Amino acid sequence: MVVGMFMAILDIQIVSSSISEIQAGLAASPDEISWVQTAYLIAEVVMIPLSGFLSRLLSTRILYVISAASFTLASLACAVAWNIESMIVFRALQGFLGGAMIPTVFAASFILFPPERRAGISVLIGLVATMAPTIGPTLGGYLTQAFSWHWLFLINLVPGVLVTTGVWFLVKFDKPNLELLKGFDFAGLALMALFLGSLEYVFEEGPRWDWFEDQSIFTFAVIGTLAGLGFFARVLSARNPIVDLRAFADRNFSLGCMFSLIIGVGLYGAVYIVPLFLARVRGLNSLQIGEIMFVTGVFQFISAPLAGMLSKKLDLRLMLGIGLVAFGTGVYLMTWITADWSFWELFWPQAIRGMSLMLLFLPINTLALGTLPPDKIKNASGLYNLMRNMGGAFGLAGINTVMIDRAALHGSRIAEHVTLTNPQVQATVDNFSQMFTAAGLGNPDLAAVKMLDNMVLKQAQVLTFADCFLLMALLFYAGLLLMPLLRAPKPAPGSGGGGGH
């Protein structure tokens, strides 16, 4: 089951480093190709909270088998997509059909295993949940360069078949409850899909189109707001709501969801912004970027057994606090970034961030879900995982907005001091001009000015990246303010593991 979850999370990021190759292969425009990522995220974010209801209706085994088998078929369809329209449809199906695997694994770990065994299981699940987005760009870049972009999807076929078969024969610990179909809340489902889908679209596309200045962003924001109001009114009044929000009455679960949102910002934000810096400022290719990003994954592996041991010796709240400080410090060190930073300058910030992720995931999983009774865990797991995904969407939207606004600000401020009336600037331009003249280039003076403009642009980008890292660090440090509100976890009655597989 964990392997299936790994595939579903991996496919969020695996295409990110190979978008240009997919665009060329499908003859897509820049606006169209962005939907390869957006369609997957919108569809997945709708399925994640729905998975709690479906697992109670169908049983964990049947839901997971349907999800894994359908995800595998959708992956094959993506690999043979004949144009951009078919790729977008298949990616949406892949995200929706595979989305159930993620919360189902989280829920099963708390239902199947007693409290004394959950630390080791949480380490494994946390490692998979954080490793997948970390190595996604690395693996994607390698597959595309070594073979072709089609292998970004074909790689899912063999594991998908094995996972589907294994779960069908080995996982048996609950039964379907088809009585839930009576009075099924179709209106609630439609409102939830509109609410979450519109919200994800606004977050994903808003920064690129200047938010509400764009008519489609404004329209979806209005639709999402109205659908959200209708959805919450529906789930609070329906006899059998599509999503049960009563788990939020548990203080630890509510706080755990807030921490999950914060982790989503950091996890997906860092995986997005570091490769962006290496591509835009350093000019590295996808494989070189992947090698640098792999440092984080290595230290996640190293820290996994350490996190498991610490969870047995430390108060989980203290462990969470250490993780927040460590992650915040890892990204704060990136605020000193320059245009010359590469592997070794990024090594320790990446290493600290990688180690901190395991110190965050294990205690948050236990604090959020460990005190809930078994009958609430399936539904709560969907909500908990939804918050991490929404944190990622919120974080990327914030990063892209800051990148646009702060780059313009830094660029204008630098330009105020970089004028040809400045003797040092004039001397630099003269040196560039002489260099281009010696190289035999036409119009060396114009080329020299353009080179100076590029230097200003690059420095503005570096300062903007530093601003993003600072905001991310402050968010994790601010998370410490929530720590006193957490209660020490005490297993709920009947929360011990049971069943077999």
Model-predicted segments: where are they?
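Small-residue-rich alpha-helical segments with characteristic i,i+4
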Residues: M131-P137, G141, L346-D430, P484
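Hydrophobic transmembrane architecture of multi-pass small-molecule transporters
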Residues: S18, E32, L162, N389-A488, ...
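Central mid-sequence intracellular linker of multi-pass
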Residues: L157-L199, D210-W211, S216-T219, I242-A249, ...
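Helix-loop-helix hairpins in multi-pass membrane proteins, especially solute transporters
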Residues: S17, I48-L189, E205
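Hydrophobic alpha-helical segments of secondary membrane carriers
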Residues: L124-V128, F259, L383-M387
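Symmetry-related core transmembrane helices of the 12-TM Major Facilitator Superfamily/SLC fold
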Residues: F153-W168, M192-F195, F220-G224, D467-P484
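Transmembrane core module of solute transporters
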Residues: M1-G52, R56-S59, Y64, S75, ...
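Membrane-embedded alpha-helical segments of multi-pass transporters/permeases
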Residues: L76-V80, T164-F169, L229-A233, Y332-T335, ...
